[in-house]
Amino acid sequence: MSKIIIWNEYLHEIENKDVADLYPHGIHGCIKEFLAKDSSLIIETATLREEHNGISENKLKDCDVLIWWGHKAHDEVLEETVNLVQRRVLEGMGLLVLHSGHHSKIFKRLMGTNCNLTWREYGEKERLWICNPGHPICAGLDPYFELEMEEMYGEP
């Protein structure tokens, strides 16, 4: 069994009715609902406004993968939270950063850059390589997969 934690700011869903209509249980709830189809996964959620941003040493202890969705409140994430997540990533926990998470404190710290980016929208095919095929979250995946119509991102 793999333990996955889905972290979300959970602000857009509270502040914007259109987003709330799309994600009545939050983006984290939508991702959890999809992943829950796999009975071999233990899935928990955490959000920005929870105590300690919903992240504790105990919660991360057995976590195999942390999915991180951030967009507009990166600066509100506590340094304590970033330190805990960084330590667990360095110990082997997987981190999947979604959407505008490239500007999250944890992603910038792990990448060692400001993570500013440039992009183009030409509908090109993107190939994503599995870097750690032995990680439980990668079980059953081919060495890579392709997305047919994607935006391309790069660091300037």
Regions found by a protein language model. Give the residues of each.
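Aromatic-Pro/Gly-enriched surface loop or interdomain linker
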Residues: 1-62
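A generic local structural motif
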Residues: 52-55, 82-83, 150-151
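An acidic, glycine-rich "communication" segment
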Residues: 98-156
